[in-house]
C-alpha cells in the first residue's frame, strides 16, 4: 500500500514542497467517492459488513493524509487562513471611532432555540463582514441568559457595542445609512450575495485546497470568533471535563427526540446511531490501540442514557470530539459540526448524519456537478451527463441522493451519490482594504 500511495502522490509534488490544488481535490474526491460507494454497497449487500477487509478501501485512502508528507503543510495552512479571518473580524469589530463606524444591528432574540439563535448571529456576522459594517448584537432579555450574550460569552467588540449613529434605516432601504437594521434570514429581501453557500473569492483558492466543504469552514470561523467564554463559563466547562475524565479518542453522539420527532425529523433508534460509532472505532483499531471506547452523549431524552448504558456496556458515556453521529436536521448537530471544522484541518467527513445533508437554514441552494454519467435503472432515478448541475434535496446515505437536474429539468429524483462532486463554490467578490492575504 505504501508503494501505491507514494506513486500516487509523487505525480503531484510541486517545486516548493506543497501539494497542488489538483492533488488535494483528487485525494478528497477519491475519499468521498469511495465513502459514497461504500454506503451503496453496504446498503445493497448487508452481509459484506461481516468481511474482515470491509474497511480497507477507506483505510487506504484515509492513509494518504499521513503518508503523502503534507500533514504539516495542511496544519500550517489551516492555521494561517484561520488567523487571517480572525484578524479581519477583530479589525471589523473594533473600529477606532465607534461614533463614526458603519454598523449592522442584529437582534439575538429570534423566536427559536439555542442552535437556531447561534445560526442567526452567524448570518448577521457574515452579512456584517460582507458589508464592512461593525456588528452590534442586541441581546438583553436573552432566554439563555437574561443579562444578554455577555453573561456567557465575551462581547463581540471591545470598543463598539452601541447602536447609536447619525442615521438609521432598515435593510437596503438606504445603503448609506450609518446604522442598518438586519431582518431574520427568512425575511431578507432582496437576497444577498453574501449568504451562506458563498465564500470570499480572495481566499477561495487556498480554502478549496485544504478543505472538503469550504462553506462549513467559513461558517466555523465566525463561531470561533463568537464563542469565547467568559471566565466563569470556561471554569464550569473545564471542571466538567475533569469530572468526567474527557479524553480522546471520543465520538460525539447527539440524539434529538421530544418536540422534533414527528414534526421536523423522524425517529431514529439508539442502534442506528451506535452502529456508526462502532464502525468508527473498528476503523480506528486497525491503526492505533483504543483502551476505552468513549462517546460524548447529548440528548433531550433522559431514557437514552439508560438505554445506551444497558445495550453498550463497553462504552464510557461522557464538542471536542473526533467524530460526530447525529441528525443534521438539528441545529445543535450542525453547530457541533461547524465548531469541529474550525478547530482541526479538514474535518469535512468526520460525521455521520442519519437524515439531512449539511445545510445552513436560509442558504442558497446546494449545487453539485456530475462527474460520471448515469443511466436511470428505475422510474425514481434520473439520467446524468458529465457536467450536469444539480441541486441537492438530501442524501439517503445508501449510496443515493435526491435532487434536481437543471439541464434536463428532472426534479426530485434519485442518482448515485458517488457520481457527483462536492458542492460547487459560490464566490462573492470582496476586496478587503486591510489585512489582505499575501497569496491566493
Please state what every model-predicted region is:
Residues 1-278, 283, 288-292:
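Secretory-pathway glycan-assembly enzymes, especially type II membrane glycosyltransferases
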Residues 2-12, 318, 408-431:
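Short, compositionally biased segments
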Residues 93-96, 125-126, 240-244, 285-286, ...:
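Beta-strand elements of modular eukaryotic interaction domains
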Residues 99-101, 115, 246-248, 290, ...:
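Eukaryote-biased feature marking scaffold/signaling PDZ-domain proteins and nuclear chromatin regulators
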Residues 124, 128, 135, 251-253, ...:
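Structural signal for hydrophobic/aromatic residues that build the beta-strand cores
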Residues 291-351, 358-359:
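Donor-binding and catalytic core of enzymes assembling or modifying cell-surface/extracellular glycoconjugates
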Residues 367-398, 402, 406-425, 440:
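SH3/SH3-like (including bacterial SH3b) beta-barrel domains
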Residues 429-440:
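Long, low-complexity intrinsically disordered regions
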